[in-house]
Amino acid sequence: MRLFLSLPVLVVVLAMVLEGPAPAQAAPEISRTFERIPDKLKEFGNTLEDKAREVLETIKQSDIPAKTRNWFSETYNKVKEQLKTAFS
């Protein structure tokens, strides 16, 4: 039953895709596209910057860096003590 329903839907979707864009959806002039590239790149850069700042602030506010630093310090001190006792 599912196959009978999915095949016509698949055929309709495939026909729409192969038909191509409608005339109203045709690509604008290439010069307009090139004119908008710097604006799009600036917008992309701004959103990327904002997201990176949010991530960094989240990391700074969390206690993960402090816990990681403490764990490395403790592990380093343990290894150092073990080496001292082993080679003494």
From Swiss-Prot:
What is any one of the record's Gene Ontology cellular component terms?
A: very-low-density lipoprotein particle
In terms of Pfam families, this protein maps to: ApoC-I
What biological-process terms (Gene Ontology) are attached? lipid transport; lipoprotein metabolic process; negative regulation of cholesterol transport; negative regulation of lipid catabolic process; negative regulation of very-low-density lipoprotein particle clearance; triglyceride metabolic process; very-low-density lipoprotein particle clearance
**Keywords, in A-Z order:** Lipid transport, Secreted, Signal, Transport, VLDL
Provide the primary localization.
secreted
Signal peptide span per the entry? 1-26
- In UniProt terms, what function does this protein have? Inhibitor of lipoprotein binding to the low density lipoprotein (LDL) receptor, LDL receptor-related protein, and very low density lipoprotein (VLDL) receptor. Associates with high density lipoproteins (HDL) and the triacylglycerol-rich lipoproteins in the plasma and makes up about 10% of the protein of the VLDL and 2% of that of HDL. Appears to interfere directly with fatty acid uptake and is also the major plasma inhibitor of cholesteryl ester transfer protein (CETP). Binds free fatty acids and reduces their intracellular esterification.
The Swiss-Prot or TrEMBL record describes its family as follows: Belongs to the apolipoprotein C1 family.
Q: What PANTHER family is this protein classified in?
A: APOLIPOPROTEIN C-I
This chain's protein is named: Apolipoprotein C-I
Q: Which organism is it from?
A: Ailurus fulgens
Phylogenetic lineage: Eukaryota, Metazoa, Chordata, Craniata, Vertebrata
